[in-house]
Swiss-Prot record:
Family that this chain belongs to: Belongs to the podoviruses GP4 family.
Domain of life according to the entry: Viruses
DNA-binding region: 77-96
Protein name: Late genes activator
Keyword Transcription belongs to the record: yes
Function: This protein is believed to be a positive regulator of late transcription. It may function as a sigma-like component of the host RNA polymerase. Binds to a region of the A3 promoter located between nucleotides -50 and -100 relative to the transcription start site, that presents a sequence-directed curvature. Full induction of this curvature is needed for the transcription activation process.
Length: 125
């Protein structure tokens, strides 16, 4: 389904509203949701870490888990992600977040153009 007159994609797989941190890629249905994510993910990381630290004092990096949670809160029309150029399910992206908890820092998100099929294949190798 193509983009609507107001610039909304109902099929996230066709969307051109894309952000990436190098490994993970999130797709958005509208420019509004993409900007809402980019404007608020750092604040959400801080709030998420405060909540976790109230429960337990952990040295783990929870940023990616916070970003996935924020993405699912912001994007109301579905959930579509890639990991290193391959489609990733909700469960796979969470497993990735758990694996990255031992890394000292998480990369920041930036807007990218939607990669073409040839670029995806190159990333998969």
């Amino acid at each position: 389904m193509p983009r609507t007159a107001r610039g909304i994609y109902h099929n996230l797989k066709e969307s051109e509203y894309v952000v990436s941190n190098g490994d993970a890629t999130f797709f958005f249905s509208s420019e509004l949701y993409l900007n809402k994510f980019l404007d608020g993910y750092q604040k959400h990381r801080e709030e998420f870490n405060k909540k976790i630290n109230r429960i337990t004092d952990t040295p783990l990096n929870m940023d990616m888990l916070a970003d996935i949670t924020f993405y699912s809160n912001v994007e109301k029309r579905g959930f579509h992600t890639w990991l290193k150029g391959c489609n990733a399910s909700w469960q796979e992206i969470h497993v990735y977040a758990l694996r990255t908890m031992t890394k000292p820092c998480t990369q920041n998100w930036s807007r990218i153009r939607k990669p073409k099929l040839a670029e995806r294949r190159k990333n998969m190798v």
